[in-house]
Amino acid sequence: LSFRHVMGRLAKVLLENVVDREDGPRLTQQDLAAMVGTAREMVSRSLRSLEDMGAIKSEGRSLRILNPDLLRDLL
């Protein structure tokens, strides 16, 4: 699978599952990998790329979506 394809599937999972609240679900990279259907390492690389692009912000063990439109563009 191509990196771009994984990024699109990860963007979809993030848009559907990330809640920008303290009590929102805490998804591990392993959880995300299972949902996307790829290896945890690929999820880690993809999350770093999405953060570099300004789409998300990783804060400790939680994720915050900064630019949902950018994530939608990856679908």
Model-derived segments and their meaning:
Residues L1-H5:
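A small-molecule sensor/coupling module
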Residues V6-R9, V13-L75:
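Phosphate-/nucleic-acid-contacting segments
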